[in-house]
Design a protein with these regions (language model features):
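Bacterial lipoprotein signal-peptidase II cleavage site
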Residues: 5, 18-35, 39-40, 46
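Extracytoplasmic "Venus flytrap"
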Residues: 64-83, 87, 91, 98-115, ...
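Hydrophobic alpha-helical
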Residues: 117, 126-143, 210, 229-292
Length: 351
């Protein structure tokens, strides 16, 4: 029996019901997206349960996954954590989760991975806080025969050092956001950008996708300022306050996540302007709070990035333990929600 140095950090007060399906399926155009059904989400969970059960039966013991989470930077991140923990809790007869909260520090994630290796977990899961600086610890995991799953963010390492990446196409998210912004401001005007954590793949790619699409397709739109808000509401507000002091003719704000957009909304209101009207708001993630803002007329569009990745994480881990091959990129399902869709979609938002 392998020793376990970490306990599963499950919050009993967080009911599993809060993880009912709330993602959306990407449509053929960037302007509409039909919400993914509860049945589809249930099918994903059921498939994961079947796969993990099969792995447990074959090996004669539980599937043990060590997961190093970034921290609690946003509502989206909390929803992802709950998805992982809830799946582990509900399938405790088949899986065991060792969970580490890195508090937004890479050194803490590296320490957690080393501990997972020492404890001999079957699979390591990681949402890397930044892209670089992982080569050595990934090599240590590889030497120990423990595959690594990257969840929702990529790492800048050789592909042979990790098994798969589960997550969204961040560049495409940025492109979709650019198209929505262009529609909202009539394809011309000055806009500002609130970037995510410096060095994080989500921030890098969402900026690349958005900026490249604006430059290529909308020559009359100018990004006049772009600065990191570190994916937090507080920093988003602070940076937006600075933007407003320096620029009086901002027509739109693009935020790499909803939390920064919500901070920007506060700053715009305090400046005596109307967010959603005087300044258009486009962001990424799809958390409940941004739907509330859209329903109130204070935001205009969110590109959803599905955080309910727990079932996919464990299904993929089970396949790896069983020696099965997996895709190098397991894509999650995302979509676009505009303000006119918010009121109808809001009752179904659980994160």
């Amino acid at each position: 029996m392998k020793k376990r140095f970490l306990s599963v950090l499950l919050c009993a007060s967080m009911a599993a019901a809060s993880l009912a399906a709330c993602s959306s399926g990407a449509s053929s155009s960037a302007t509409t997206a039909a919400p993914q059904t509860t049945a589809a989400q249930s099918e994903t969970t059921a498939k994961a349960e079947e796969t993990t059960a099969k792995a447990a039966d074959t090996a004669g013991e539980k599937l043990v996954v060590g997961f190093a989470q970034i921290g609690q930077e946003s509502g989206w991140r909390d929803a992802e954590t709950l998805s992982i923990q809830t799946y582990a809790s509900e399938n405790g007869d088949k899986v065991e989760l060792l969970f580490a909260d890195a508090q937004q520090k890479q050194e803490n994630q590296i320490k957690a991975i080393k501990n997972f290796i020492e404890q001999g977990v079957d699979v390591i899961g990681l949402a890397p806080v930044v892209e670089t600086g992982w080569d050595q610890v990934f090599a240590e995991a590889q030497e120990a025969g423990i595959p690594i799953i990257l969840l929702d963010r990529r790492a800048d390492v050789s592909e042979d050092l990790y098994a798969t990446f589960i997550g969204s196409d961040f560049i495409e998210e940025g492109k979709m956001a650019a198209k929505e912004m262009a529609k909202l401001i009539g394809e011309e005007g000055k806009i500002v950008e609130l970037e995510g954590t410096v060095g994080a793949s989500a921030a890098t790619d969402r900026k690349t996708g958005f900026d490249d699409e604006i430059k290529a397709s909308y020559p009359k739109i100018e990004i006049i300022a772009s600065q990191t808000g570190d994916f937090t509401r507080a920093q988003g507000k602070e940076v937006m306050e600075s933007f407003l002091k320096s620029n009086k003719d901002i027509k739109g704000v693009y935020a790499h996540n909803d939390d920064m957009a919500l901070g920007a909304i506060e700053a715009i209101k305090e400046a005596g302007l109307k967010p959603g009207e005087d300044i258009k708001i486009v962001s990424i993630d799809g958390v409940r709070a941004i739907f509330e803002a859209m329903a109130a007329g204070e935001a205009n569009c969110t590109v959803e990035c599905n955080p309910l990745l727990g079932p996919l994480l464990f299904e993929t881990a089970a396949k790896l333990k069983a020696g099965e091959s997996v895709e190098k990129w397991v894509k999650s399902v995302d979509g676009v929600f505009t303000a006119d869709m918010a009121a109808e979609a809001l009752p179904n938002r659980k994160y």
